[in-house]
């Protein structure tokens, strides 16, 4: 083979291979340090699928958190309903006691009437003032809607649960103890219906929450299987291309030394 001095063919080839090896080394270093195998052009299609799965997984997790907020609201409503029931118990006692008016003095009847009226005012205050995070829990004919689904194609899944029936308007007219026992019975009937709605709502939300948590975990696991770095494989690649880079650089030096032999002929 003739010696030519105008171009170092071997050195150029070796330099090119060294460049490729360094590129692959850098890619392996980035994948190992980031934990993401799809970067540096590793898998564009996988990145697209993985990102979509991860986004949906996180959305389902947030849906589960929304369900938890709904459960908290319903538990608050349950406590309010039970307190209303306690007031209804006392209201019924007052009504029954007031029925025995033949043995009550005028002052006794006045005391009973004042307590009954105060309970009526308290019930009205509870209806208006009972809130969860600023949202009214008890209002006439109110339905509470909990959005616990995920947005798919622009549609958000939701569930509407009637948490409270309208508490009887009779509470607005409680001015005395007479007949308060009948009003208490109406209140207790509403409380019973309300507690049934609450229990059903909590069961529904817990079921949806469990599904949302499970879906989130599986979607994020699927995304991880696509996008996460295979550390064993990538470490082997880093070692391989590190050796190739060192070998190529050594060959560049060897090729350059071979070219110097041409000059030796001229001396």
Language model features with spans:
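Surface-exposed loop/turn positions within long extracellular repeat scaffolds
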Residues: 106, 231-237
